[in-house]
UniProtKB/Swiss-Prot annotation:
Disruption phenotype: Deletion mutant is attenuated in vitro and in vivo, and shows enhanced MHC class II-restricted antigen presentation during in vivo infection of mice. Also shows a reduced capability to inhibit autophagy and an increased acidification and lysosomal fusion of phagosomes during infection of phagocytic cells. It is found in: Secreted; Cell surface; Host cytoplasm, Host cytosol. This is PE-PGRS family protein PE_PGRS47. The gene is PE_PGRS47. It comes from Mycobacterium tuberculosis (strain ATCC 25618 / H37Rv). SUPFAM superfamilies: PE/PPE dimer-like. Transmembrane segments: none annotated. Residues 1-93 form the PE domain. GO terms for cellular component: cell surface; extracellular region; host cell cytosol. Contributes to evasion of both innate and adaptive immunity. Inhibits autophagy in infected host phagocytes and inhibits major histocompatibility complex (MHC) class II antigen presentation by mycobacteria-infected dendritic cells. Has an important role in the growth and survival of M.tuberculosis, particularly during intracellular growth and in the later chronic phase of infection. Keywords: Host cytoplasm, Secreted, Virulence. Belongs to the mycobacterial PE family. PGRS subfamily. Residues 514-525 have a biased composition (Low complexity).
Length: 525
């Protein structure tokens, strides 16, 4: 049995290239014939005549050899062309009986269930919004959804679901619209029950109509046993302007399969008011974690970032999406997803968007019940007025709290640092408070307070105040208290400013049974 794999189209292309090369060589040989076969003697003497005759004999021998080589080349090209034709004919002959066999197998399943046993689902036609066909029950990927009709605001078709093995189809894109809202994207199809990737959600359509909204992105499909959830689609842009114009929200990420991760949320669409980022999909029961939230859309007012997905039973929470940039106001960051129900760390909060009035950072996600660290708070955005940092998440029964996010830098005022998350009940240290944001012409931001410790553990340190040039310096945050055994957190340092110096943070109390109080923060020297 031969294990050679042939591609007829490549063989045909190679034969054409060889034929072209042969034609070029033949033309060159013909052009060289006249000056090399009949060479005139340089003089009438015997030596010149003999030399001319010798070179002429060489030219004649080359021409004879060239004729033989041309014949061999032509035979080789003919053989290669015939081989390509034979392979193509064999493939065409094999397709018909195989397809007939598949049709016979699929017929009873189509009749009873409206779905084949083997084979991919049909794609929806572009411009129709048709749903993609479902893949074969045993094996086959779902078809992609068709896009909406351009200019109509029609929703995109949903992607088809896969069978036991196969990938879910992607959702179709929503249609644009000049007289209303953009069309929503289609949802992604579910991945194969045993194995396969879930389909992504379709992107929302844009609009140019006054005070209209872009289409929402489609949700990602759900994963199978071992598959991750599909990513959500991007929200459509709203380009018509107006007070009510808003970008489409990003699609939610798909839920992960039993052992799969959640899908990422889609980004919000651009507009005067940016769309909200899609939420990350929840992780499967035994999956690695939830999906990250989508970024908020850009605009005069940035969109809020999507929240991260939860982590199933034992996974990590997904990170919150960053807030969208804005010329006037930035979007707030999304909250981090909660850790797994049993154990798992919380996801980090998303950063606030940059703007004149910057967005606040998202709060960190709480850890799982038994064990895990709380997620860190997101940093506040920077701009004219810096955004506040997000608070850290709470730790599990055994686990430390998450750190607070730093306040954003602002030319007119710095943002406040986020509070550190409290530790779990039994064991763990409190999270550190975030530092206050710096400023040039306004007050510096105050530092965040440190989180409280568990029964055994240390309190979190307070964040330092933000420095400034013209305004008042930020105050340091207080340190977190210990509980039974452990040292209290140190207070944050005060910052200097031309209009005054902030207060120092007070150290947290030490443990009731053992542990020293935290030290107070320092004044600037």
């Amino acid at each position: 049995m031969s294990f050679v794999i042939a591609a007829p189209e490549f063989l045909t292309a190679a034969a054409m290239d060889l034929a072209s090369i042969g034609s070029t060589v033949s033309a060159a040989s013909a052009a060289a014939s006249a000056p090399t076969v009949a060479i005139l003697a340089a003089g009438a003497d015997e030596v010149s005549i003999a030399v001319a005759a010798l070179f002429g004999m060489h030219g004649q021998a080359y021409q004879a050899l060239s004729v033989q080589a041309s014949a061999f080349h032509q035979q080789f090209v003919q053989a290669l062309t015939a081989g390509a034709y034979s392979y193509a004919s064999a493939e065409a002959a094999a397709v018909t009986p195989l397809q007939q066999l598949v049709d016979v197998i699929n017929a009873p399943f189509r009749s009873a269930l409206g779905r084949p046993l083997i084979g991919n689902g049909a794609n929806g036609k572009p411009g129709t919004g048709q749903d993609g066909g479902a893949g074969g029950l045993l094996y086959g990927s779902g078809g992609n959804g068709g896009s909406g009709l351009a200019g109509s605001g029609q929703k995109g078709g949903n992607g088809g679901a896969a069978g036991l093995f196969g990938n879910g189809g992607a959702g179709g894109a929503g249609a644009s619209n000049q007289a209303g809202n953009g069309g929503a994207g289609g949802n992604g199809g579910a991945g194969g029950l045993i194995w396969g990737t879930a389909g992504t959600g379709g992107n929302g359509g844009f609009t140019t109509f006054l005070d209209a909204a872009g289409g929402a992105g489609g949700a990602g499909g759900a994963g199978g046993l071992f598959g991750a959830g599909g990513a959500g689609g991007v929200g459509g842009a709203a380009l018509g302007g107006g007070a009510q114009a808003a970008g489409g929200n990003g699609g939610a990420g798909g839920v992960g399969g039993l052992f799969g991760a959640g899908g990422a949320g889609g980004a919000g669409g651009f507009s005067d008011t940016g769309g909200t980022g899609g939420a990350g999909g929840a992780g499967g029961l035994f999956g690695p974690g939830g999906g990250s939230g989508g970024v908020g859309g850009f605009g005069d007012t940035g969109g809020t970032g999507g929240d991260g997905g939860s982590g199933g039973l034992f996974g990590v929470g997904g990170a919150g999406g960053h807030g969208g940039f804005g010329s006037a106001a930035g979007g707030d960051g999304g909250a981090g997803g909660a850790g797994g129900t049993v154990f798992g760390s919380g996801g980090a909060g998303g950063a606030g968007g940059v703007a004149t009035v910057a967005g606040h950072g998202g709060h960190g996600g709480n850890a799982g019940l038994l064990y895990g660290t709380g997620g860190a708070g997101g940093a506040g955005g920077f701009g004219g007025f810096g955004g506040d940092g997000g608070d850290g998440g709470i730790g599990g029964l055994v686990g430390s709290g998450g750190a607070g996010g730093s306040g954003g830098t602002g030319t007119l005022s710095g943002g406040r640092g986020g509070a550190g998350g409290n530790a779990g009940t039994f064991y763990g240290s409190g999270g550190a408070g975030g530092a206050g944001g710096e400023s040039d012409n306004g007050d510096g931001g105050n530092g965040g307070v440190g989180g409280k410790a568990g029964l055994v553990g240390e309190g979190g340190n307070g964040g330092d105040g933000g420095a400034t040039i013209a305004g008042k310096g930020g105050s340091g945050g207080n340190g977190g208290n210990a509980w039974l055994t452990g040292q209290g957190g140190n207070g944050g340092n005060a910052a200097f400013g031309k209009a005054g110096t902030g207060s120092v943070g007070v150290g947290g109390a030490g443990g009731l049974l053992e542990g020293q109080n935290g030290e107070n923060g320092l004044l600037p020297s």
